[in-house]
Amino acid sequence: MPIPDQIIWKTIADRYNQLWNLPNCVGSIDGKHIRIKAPANSGSSFFNYKGYFSVVLMATADADGKFITIDVGEYGRNSDGRVFKECTFGQLLLKNKLNLPKNSCLPHEENDPAFPYYFVADEAFPLLDNVMRPYPRRSLTNTKIIFNYRGRKSVECAFGMMASKFKILEGPINFKTERIETVIKAVCVLHNFIHVYDGKYSIPQEIQQEDVDILLYEDIEGNL
């Protein structure tokens, strides 16, 4: 998949702010283990912490659950953090070669310093100028809980929608490693094609209800 230019990154950020209320966010990052049959003479290289053999799909997704970048083929035993640092996307981000827009002020904070455009990720990823991790679990406010919840929702939805459509991902996939990578890349492209053909999904009401559920849960917990 081609790396977006600055105009497309800004379009992605605008949609993220519209749908998820995360200004300057240009995507969410996560890794997914794709179950495979153990390649010959591979030892434990593909054996992951979940107890099966896999290759890692490292992906970024936009606000609507469409993939922006994909990297496929890292050993299943590697952590998301390590895969991120070694994959093409991670290398481009770490070297500031993703063509991200220049820092800009957040909405209603025009007097504050300009803020970087960023990706959201979980605790397995490094905290960088352009990568935001969840707030630590201790002493979370309602606002922080909602941010943590929303952070990786779009990429998780992308993985879920893709897996529900393409049963080959239930695995184990029994091809040569190179063919497996080709199949996974093709599935990601088809996922995006179907997503565009079907139209963008709109989930503000779902988000609002989930946010309310989180707030109610916190109120109950606080009163126990």
Language-model segment annotations:
Residues 1-224:
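Short, well-ordered secondary-structure "scaffold" segments embedded in the functional core
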